[in-house]
Amino acid sequence: MWFWFSLIALICWSGSDLFSKIGCQDADDKYSHLKMVMAVGLVMGLHAAYEIFINGTEINGSIILTYLPVSLLYISSMTIGYIGLRYIELSISSPICNSSGALVAVLALATGGLGELVPAQLAATALVCVGVIGLGIVEAREDNDLRAARQQASNHRYAKSALALILPVIYCLLDALGTFADSRVLEALNEDSANCAYELTFLLAGIVCFVYVVLIKKSRLVPKREGPKYAGAVCETAGQFAYIYALADTEHVALAAPIISAYCVASVLWSRIFLKEKLSWKHYAMIALVVAGIVILGVYDA
């Protein structure tokens, strides 16, 4: 079953990328990112309720507070990522956002973890860093006429913008810090309890966003626009569920991890098929470096 859970995680998380992009890309809705937080908060809250009341997962105020710094880092990173989806192609955003594993390796080095990393992991980290920096250079130097020409068939047009690259990078930094902190906090907490604490904190964030967006700012919730957000939220939560079960099969973790870590490849594919995004060969070359590094890190993470 590990293989099918791995595929489900890959499909769901790449689907979350796609639906989140569709739900957050409208520039005329300045609260779309907060509405996405509302959607994810609701779905995660429902899943937390299932885990607590049906599966009997232990949760209390102490656990929630202990895990709170990690939860806030993850939630902040996702919110920043949702904002960034307005300004840049998913084909570029997803590989950058999913490069956080390389930054975790860098953090491990900075805190004295050099002995725990093998040369292949260092090489993979270098590949990811070169690829992300290369994507930034390609984006910055691309001729405006060539950009307009390749975006001709796309559903949206994106102007050259420093913000477009900065936001996915901020997501990557915050997610890496969250993952690094996660590894420390989970030494004292049960993983299921920590996940419930995260989901309940996300639910609270969603409620706060609802109060601000709907009750204070009086922004309307249009079903046609909100639908993709909730589809993305379901995919995000289902992907997390499948991920846990895929890695629970300890005999096949070394095979499951790289399959799941390559979900940004599927995100690039979906963006090409459904969003009609088209990049230059230089973009794809840099993305290939990032993906190769992510997959190698996934193998050794197992």
Pin down the residues of each PLM region.
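Loop-to-transmembrane-helix transition segments
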Residues: W2-A9, A39, A49-I80, A162-L173, ...
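Juxtamembrane helix-loop-helix junctions in multi-pass membrane proteins
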Residues: G15-L42, T57, L174-L204
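Structural signature of hydrophobic alpha-helical transmembrane segments
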Residues: M1-W13, N60-Y74, V118-V130, D192-A205, ...
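Membrane-interface helix-cap regions at the ends of transmembrane helices
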Residues: V43-S62, A110-E116, I133-S154, R184, ...
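Structural motif at transmembrane-helix junctions in multi-pass transporters
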Residues: A27-S32, I80-I96, L114-G115, E187-N195, ...
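Loop-to-transmembrane alpha-helix entry segments
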Residues: C97, G112-A148, I273-I296
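Hydrophobic/small/kink-forming positions within alpha-helical transmembrane segments
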Residues: S14, L18, A49, S71, ...
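Alpha-helical transmembrane segments of compact multi-pass small-molecule transporters, enriched
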Residues: L42-H47, I96-T111, L204-V208, G239-A242, ...
